[in-house]
């Protein structure tokens, strides 16, 4: 039985669910879950939690993500990416803007911004996914959402051809960010229709492309009994949370028994959630949170016996 986090390289054409389904067959275990959907046409890093690591999948999902995308100015689509039908065209020429204009524009997207999720997305409105409305040619008001663009920059020259302009960007962002919506919004600010023509997720949950294995590589390593060496411990998925190392065996026992604590037992360091780590084994003991009605206390959220 495997336990740990496995960064998978999801190839284009597969859904995130396809990856989990195939892994369950390869590894012969059902206890597998991915940490955030990647659209079928998007390639890149998809961390997968296996065995007891499924208990930290939410925390891996909450960690930052990084993408490399190609923005295409001059044509918009129904899906905001290359898979959709053309909505609008407007010829773009090198006299319309230059790379300095693009760089200044990209700076304006840094920080907390508002996005309207695309119609072809799994965001739910009134209990129904937006893509279900879109497939039925129904329109519905889409709620604006705040997302965090931690960094964004151009990583290629501008390529003007066939009345369009194409360039690559790198984006570091929080969860829930739609890069294709970002591409269309870049076009709006330039005064042109636009879409995202290619996307690769280069980092997710602290895992990068070079860490990631294809399904074929995973199958081969499993057959050689050497896959466990490629898994990251579940503790890796909690590195975004503050932690305290516990030496006292009596306190360790209380933690593993799920007892409540007064915050002042830990110098009031705990603001929201805290990970308790065994000082001897470096293994996580539990995740605690501030008590919802007694702010001076902390209570267990997850205990790892």
UniProtKB/Swiss-Prot annotation:
Gene3D superfamilies named among the record's database cross-references: Pseudouridine synthase (3.30.2350.10)
Alphabetized UniProt keyword annotations: Isomerase, tRNA processing
Keyword tRNA-binding on entry: no
MF (Gene Ontology): RNA binding; tRNA pseudouridine(55) synthase activity
GO terms classed as biological process: mRNA pseudouridine synthesis; tRNA pseudouridine synthesis
Record keyword Aminoacyl-tRNA synthetase present: no
Catalytic EC class: isomerase
Catalytic activity entry: uridine(55) in tRNA = pseudouridine(55) in tRNA
Domain of life (superkingdom): Bacteria
Active-site residues annotated for this sequence: 39
Xref: InterPro entries: PsdUridine_synth_cat_dom_sf (IPR020103), PsdUridine_synth_N (IPR002501), tRNA_psdUridine_synth_TruB (IPR014780), TruB_C (IPR032819)
Catalytic activity, EC: 5.4.99.25
Role, per record: Responsible for synthesis of pseudouridine from uracil-55 in the psi GC loop of transfer RNAs.
PANTHER family on file: PSEUDOURIDYLATE SYNTHASE TRUB1, TRNA-PSEUDOURIDINE SYNTHASE
Family to which this protein belongs: Belongs to the pseudouridine synthase TruB family. Type 1 subfamily.
Protein name from the UniProt record: tRNA pseudouridine synthase B
Organism whose genome encodes this protein: Staphylococcus aureus (strain MSSA476)
